[in-house]
Amino acid sequence: MSFVVANTEFVSGAAGNLARLGSMISAANSAAAAQTTAVAAAGADEVSAAVAALFGAHGQTYQVLSAQAAAFHSQFVQALSGGAQAYAAAEATNFGPLQPLFDVINAPTLALLNRPLIGNGADGTAANPNGQAGGLLIGNGGNGFSPAAGPGGNGGAAGLLGHGGNGGVGALGANGGAGGTGGWLFGNGGAGGNSGGGGGAGGIGGSAVLFGAGGAGGISPNGMGAGGSGGNGGLFFGNGGAGASSFLGGGGAGGRAFLFGDGGAGGAALSAGSAGRGGDAGFFYGNGGAGGSGAGGASSAHGGAGGQAGLFGNGGEGGDGGALGGNGGNGGNAQLIGNGGDGGDGGGAGAPGLGGRGGLLLGLPGANGT
């Protein structure tokens, strides 16, 4: 027996994009029809008339073919939209009969652990801002609540298989919520919530456990709080999450990988402070994450250092310093085989970053910043 898994939102979105594309092409063909189907002769002689008639015939043939292509395009979009509606209807139809079965399956674990066996965790609410944990076997963690006052709720953790919930956005002056941990066997960590500005820090991205990527840290868009650090990748495989940027505080550090995977990029510091350091790569293989930039313009922030490479991989590049005297970050080192990361450029009177060391067996050192 074969099974089909369809994301109805993606299918509907694709149908809408194709419909808009078809409308644009039809409008372009209509605009060009007058100039291409009735070409005026360059002169009164027979040769000019024959050339004009030839090009006009080509234009008319093109319009006929375009009309046929537009009809096929319209039929395809209708079929795609109908398929999305059919999948959505099937899901809605199946939900009712299957819900009692899920209730029976989840009843023992709900009674013992207050957690379902299968199913996604509920999103946070004003009364309980933290997202609920997903099912022990399969299920994503719920997203944290974004309140009008106070910190954002934390994302819920996944079970054995599933992704962690995203942290909620903090209110003015409050921190964003941390992302939830990914599934024990497979799943990505949730993204940290953004701060509401005015001093709040972005939430830390959730980490993966065995296989999966760490979640990105939350942004501190216009306050003095730091950007959230990226979550760590899974123990066996997975990239670290990217650190987030901050306006006045420091950028968040990129998450690290453990055995196989790339380190996450550090977050930028947009005005002052220091940009986030790039995450280190997995021990055996992976590239170090790039250090965050001290940004340009009226910034004195220092660039973040690049992350260290694995045994096989390249070191991360150091971030550039801000234009008003920020130091460039040092490039990350390679280990056995790989190139060192380039050092970041210093801004104004800021010192440039040093290039990372090349691999001991094979590899070039990174260039120093200027």
Swiss-Prot record:
**Which keywords, in A-to-Z order, does the entry hold?**
Cell wall, Secreted, Virulence
Q: Give the chief site where it resides.
A: secreted
Q: What is the recorded phenotype of mutating residue 65 to G?
A: Reduces interaction with host ubiquitin. Shows enhanced viability, reduced p62 aggregation and reduced colocalization with LC3 and LAMP1 in BMDMs
Q: Tell me where in or outside the cell this protein is found.
A: Secreted, Cell wall; Cell surface
Knockout mutant characteristics = Deletion mutant shows enhanced viability, reduced p62 aggregation and reduced colocalization with LC3 and LAMP1 in bone marrow-derived murine macrophages (BMDMs).
Spell out the Gene3D superfamilies in the cross-references.
HP0062-like domain (1.10.287.850)
The record's region (UBA) falls at: 1-72
Tell me the Pfam families matching this sequence.
Answer: PE (PF00934), PGRS (PF21526)
Mutagenesis / variant outcome for changing residue 64 to G: Reduces interaction with host ubiquitin
UniProt induction comment = Up-regulated after infection of macrophages.
- Which residues are annotated as site, described as Important for interaction with host ubiquitin? 64-65
Q: Determine the domain of life of the protein's source.
A: Bacteria
What residue stretches are annotated with the PE domain? 1-93
Q: Which GO terms describe its cellular component?
A: cell surface; extracellular region
Q: Which InterPro entries match?
A: PE-PGRS_N, PGRS_rpt
The text of the family note is: Belongs to the mycobacterial PE family. PGRS subfamily.
* Purpose of the protein: Mediates direct binding of host ubiquitin (Ub) to the mycobacterial surface, which triggers host xenophagy. Interaction between Rv1468c and ubiquitin recruits autophagy receptor p62 to deliver mycobacteria into LC3-associated autophagosomes. It could be a viable evolutionary strategy adopted by M.tuberculosis to maintain long-term intracellular survival through self-controlling its intracellular bacterial loads to avoid excessive host inflammatory immune responses.
Show the domain comment: Contains a eukaryotic-like ubiquitin-associated (UBA) domain that mediates interaction with host ubiquitin.
The subunit structure is: Interacts directly with host polyubiquitin in a UBA-dependent manner.
- Designated name of the protein: Ubiquitin-binding protein Rv1468c
